[in-house]
From Swiss-Prot:
It is found in: Host membrane. It is a multi-pass membrane protein. This is Immunity protein TsiV2. The keyword Transmembrane helix applies. The chain crosses the membrane at residues 39-59, 66-86, 118-138. The keyword Membrane applies. Disruption phenotype: Deletion mutant is susceptible to killing by V52 strain in a VasX-dependent manner. It comes from the Bacteria.
Amino acid sequence: MLIDKNELEQLKVKLHSSEVIYQWDSVAYGERRSEIFRVFGAISAGIVPLWPFIFFADIQFNSKEFWGFICFSLAGMAAARYLFMPDHRYCYSLTQAGIYYTDQEVIPDAAYTFVRGFAWVGIAVCLLALAVVGPLAFVGAGGFALLAFGLTNFHPTVHKKEVYFADQLIVFDPIKEKMVDLNTDSTDEPWFDRRLFFSSLDEKTHFIELVKSIHNNVDYLPLQRVNDQYKHPIFNQELKEE
């Protein structure tokens, strides 16, 4: 079943005009496995590019150069963790028609300040190059100049999103995770399929009980692992159609 723009707009109006039954907040990055990958990713981002220089450049242990590389490694790890793989803060509102929520990356204010400061330094460097070299300076540095101007207004962005309840609702519940996946076999439209996060398992349980009480056709499926949901017929049917 496909949803046209008019139907989608009607669903959105109904969702936002419905009474809010429950609200909750959560700060999350993903399932537990994603957290582990993020740790290894941040460590790799800081160590892998720089450690070869320490071993092959004959840098003495405890020297200024050594500690300089260590500082660069730590900065790389922090950048990877907080800028490229940040947590997300979700603020959910449950209604009888679905859920609307906001999604914002949790990036420290210091990171925004640093990036904006770096952008202004980049602009100053480009202007200096223009004064010394002339217009030819932007042949090589034009891209950096455009990027620098764009980053001067770098600030946190809040995204507003919705997920609607189909006539038939599937709740996949990985019992060890503080998350659920909502889906349906009524349509493959993305507005009916969403992953939701919670601050605790008790909060998740309360949400599930509320959904069961307000929706008359809920298929609740507890899972041992997140990927067990892909054994469900709705995913097998999609594979057959492809």
